[in-house]
Amino acid sequence: MSHTLDIKTSGKSLNEAEKVLIMIHGRGGSAEDILSLAQHLNVEDYALLAPQATNGSWYPLSFIAPVEQNEPWLSSAIETVGKTVKTALDAGIKAENIYFFGFSQGACLSLEFLARNAQKYGGAVAIIGGVIGDKINRENYKGDFAQTPVFLGTSNPDFHVPVERVYATANILKEMNADVTEKVYANFGHSINEEEVELANSIVFK
């Protein structure tokens, strides 16, 4: 009961690129779906890596269910993100040139991985997501983001992600020395809007 490592690629090859964008899809989505979003981002010179969740979902239940109820899939999903990062590092890409983009379940997974492995990255965009668990276990989160730019966009209300968890996540990342911008859109629905793409480009992919 674990994810098979299956990384889809697009953009520049790892050999050519100096920067890498890791894109994490949402529940029921696919690596190809989220890679197609890259055409709207300022990432023409990046290598794009998108791991595919086995069975289309990173973990079975809500991200605010008790953590043990999402195991062993959750730990395997976090490990998959780590292996995707290692793929970039092994190609000679520095961590400060590795970027992240996640939507919904993929945003939650991206944020959970980053908070557990804080260091200076290129930047991160998380649309409708927060750190994972029914309660936030602050002991899991260590490191220093060294002012890594992070953009959190969400809708309020959102059926899957309470806005309170987005704010709590922003506060944790700020405590860990990330440069966080959060933007809440009233009644926008569970999707990515045009302004979020523009903000992602101006804050992170600049």
Q: How would you name each of these model-derived features?
A:
Residues 2-97:
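Serine-hydrolase catalytic machinery in alpha/beta-hydrolase-like enzymes
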Residues 100-102, 127, 153:
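Short beta-strand immediately N-terminal to the catalytic nucleophile in serine-hydrolase-like folds
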Residues 151-154, 158:
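Short beta-strand/loop motif that positions the catalytic acidic residue
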Residues 36, 112-116:
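Active-site signature of alpha/beta-hydrolase-fold catalytic machinery across serine-
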Residues 27, 167-170, 174-206:
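C-terminal catalytic histidine-bearing segment of alpha/beta-hydrolase fold enzymes
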Residues 34-37, 138, 162-172:
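Short alpha-helix in the alpha/beta-hydrolase fold that links the catalytic acid
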Residues 119-132:
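A conserved short beta-strand
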Residues 101-106, 110:
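Gly/Ala-rich beta-loop-alpha elbow adjacent to hydrolase catalytic centers
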